[in-house]
């Protein structure tokens, strides 16, 4: 082995505003606002900017001014910087701009289009679902019960080639999605769902947009191996959720996942997070959710 000291003259860093905002159709806008730092800077100098002016524009018309909330219960990248919250409901199909002004920095803004959903879920067939169990590790002799087996439903409607679609299924009284798998071509043919050369159970299944109308019956296998969670009530309904992500959100979350996978890997390639902010750094993106609940 050999050792060598390499000295590099890094250029001076001009701090810029950073914006982290992921809009959701039907919800109010929230944004985390801070400032950039030199890569070798002291993280103790990282601070919130509660006096910033954060304005939401819809189709180039100002519709909301977000108010700073000092929410210390939620950390952003391990820093407590609070969040700016609005009261205007975000709508599908609209173009939104989040603009930030703060006296010490250049004005920064980012734009995105909030997606809508054109896919319908119908003809849900639960007849092939079974009840299984596993030992309750917290109570000797007790068992946790859950549903498994095939769930079928029809998905129909025009897909948008600029959007990304994620399916998940939960019990009405549970937060964690069930593990599931599908060999349907629109699922199994997606590289996103493939790991180590095969399709494995996942808590969400991905299919991408295209220019054709979707009209197929999906067969989903719920909890094909087992379950980590028991259901509080195995007689209540299931929630089939379709999350529709615009490309800004999809690309950011994909790169963020790559970053999380690379954090403790010294041989991993550097991950560059997407940036669509003019005059600063960060991301403004949007998504929508559609839910269908079984009886």
Residue ranges of predicted features:
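A sequence/structural signal for flexible, mid-protein segments enriched
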Residues: 3-295
């Amino acid at each position: 082995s050999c050792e060598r000291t390499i000295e590099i003259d890094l250029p001076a860093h001009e701090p810029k505003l950073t914006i982290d905002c992921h809009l959701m159709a039907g919800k109010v806008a929230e944004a985390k606002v801070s400032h950039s730092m030199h890569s070798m800077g002291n993280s103790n100098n990282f601070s919130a900017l509660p006096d910033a002016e954060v304005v939401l524009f819809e189709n180039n018309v100002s519709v909301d001014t977000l108010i700073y909330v000092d929410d210390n219960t939620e950390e952003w990248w391990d820093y407590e910087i609070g969040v700016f919250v609005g009261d205007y409901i975000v709508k599908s199909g609209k173009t939104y701009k989040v603009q930030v002004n703060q006296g010490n920095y250049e004005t920064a803004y980012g734009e995105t289009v909030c997606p809508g959903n054109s896919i319908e879920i119908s003809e849900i067939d639960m007849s092939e679902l079974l009840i299984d169990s596993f030992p309750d590790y917290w109570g000797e002799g007790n068992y946790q019960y859950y549903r498994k087996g095939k769930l079928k439903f029809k998905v129909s409607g025009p897909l948008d080639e600029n959007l990304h679609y994620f399916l998940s299924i939960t019990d009405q009284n549970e937060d964690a999605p069930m593990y599931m798998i599908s060999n349907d071509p629109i699922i199994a043919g997606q590289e996103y769902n493939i790991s180590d050369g095969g399709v494995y159970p996942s808590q969400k299944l991905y299919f991408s947009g295209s220019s054709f109308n979707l009209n197929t019956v999906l067969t989903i296998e719920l909890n094909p191996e087992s379950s980590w969670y028991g259901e509080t009530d195995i007689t209540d309904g299931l929630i089939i959720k379709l999350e529709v992500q615009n490309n800004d959100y999809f690309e950011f979350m994909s790169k963020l996942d790559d970053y999380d996978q690379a954090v403790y890997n010294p041989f991993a390639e550097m991950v560059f997070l997407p940036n669509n902010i003019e005059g600063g750094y960060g991301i403004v993106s949007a998504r929508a959710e559609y839910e269908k609940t079984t009886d």
